[in-house]
UniProtKB/Swiss-Prot annotation:
A GO MF term: S-adenosyl-L-methionine binding
Keyword list, A-Z: Cytoplasm, Ribosome biogenesis, rRNA processing, S-adenosyl-L-methionine, Transferase
Function: Aminocarboxypropyltransferase that catalyzes the aminocarboxypropyl transfer on pseudouridine corresponding to position 914 in M.jannaschii 16S rRNA. It constitutes the last step in biosynthesis of the hypermodified N1-methyl-N3-(3-amino-3-carboxypropyl) pseudouridine (m1acp3-Psi).
UniProt-recorded name of the protein: 16S rRNA aminocarboxypropyltransferase
Highest rank taxon of the organism: Archaea
Length: 173
C-alpha cells in the first residue's frame, strides 16, 4: 500500500497595501518564500481558491483538488469594499468556518484572522497540517493558533463538504 504524501499548496497573496508593513503576516510569508505577493488582481492564478469572508460556500476537504490558495491582504476595515471587485475574476470564493484569531492585533476575536492564520486554517482543513505548521512556525504566536483551534480544525478537516462544515461550525458558535 502506498503512503499518501501531502502535496504542498501554492499560496498567493493579493496585497492591497493597507496594513502596517511591520505587522503584515503576508509580507513576512513572502520574505520566507512561503507565499507569492501580487499587486495586480489579474496575476492571481485562474481557478484559485480565494479565501473570502463573504463567500456563500465554506471551504471544505471537497476543495482539495485545487492547488492554488489566495488571500486578500487588506485591512478588516475595508474588506467589504475590496472583495466585490474580485467577483468578476475566475476564482473559487470560499469562506473559512468559525475560528478564533491568536495574532497580537485581534487575539481572541472570531473570524478576524491574519493572512497566515487564514492560510494555515485552509491548509489544515484541506489535509496539509505539515504545511500549516510550517508557515505558522515563522511567527512566535503561530503555534497558539493551532492549539487554540485544534478541536474545530480537526472536525472541519473530517467534513465531506461545505454543508457539513456549516453544521460543524454551528456547534462552536
Amino acid at each position: 500500500m502506498k503512503k499518501q504524501i501531502d502535496k504542498d499548496y501554492h499560496l498567493h497573496i493579493f496585497h492591497a497595501k493597507q496594513c502596517d508593513p511591520k505587522k503584515c503576516t503576508g509580507k513576512k510569508m513572502a520574505r520566507f518564500e512561503l507565499a507569492r505577493i501580487f499587486d495586480k488582481v489579474q496575476k492571481i492564478p485562474r481557478g484559485s481558491i480565494l479565501l473570502d469572508p463573504m463567500a456563500k460556500q465554506a471551504l471544505s476537504p471537497a476543495d482539495k483538488h485545487e492547488q492554488n490558495i489566495t488571500v486578500l491582504d487588506c485591512s478588516w476595515e475595508t474588506v467589504e469594499e475590496v472583495f466585490p471587485h474580485l467577483m468578476r475574476l475566475h476564482l473559487q470564493h470560499r469562506a473559512l468556518p468559525y475560528l478564533v484569531a491568536t495574532n497580537p492585533v485581534n487575539f481572541g476575536r472570531p473570524f478576524k484572522l491574519t493572512s497566515v492564520e487564514a492560510f494555515a486554517a485552509a491548509l489544515y482543513i484541506l489535509g496539509n497540517k505539515k504545511q500549516a505548521e510550517k508557515i505558522l512556525s515563522k511567527f512566535n504566536w503561530g503555534h497558539v493558533f493551532l492549539d487554540m483551534n485544534k478541536e474545530p480544525l480537526e472536525d472541519y478537516s473530517k467534513a465531506k463538504d461545505s454543508n457539513e462544515i456549516i453544521k460543524i461550525q454551528s456547534e462552536y458558535m
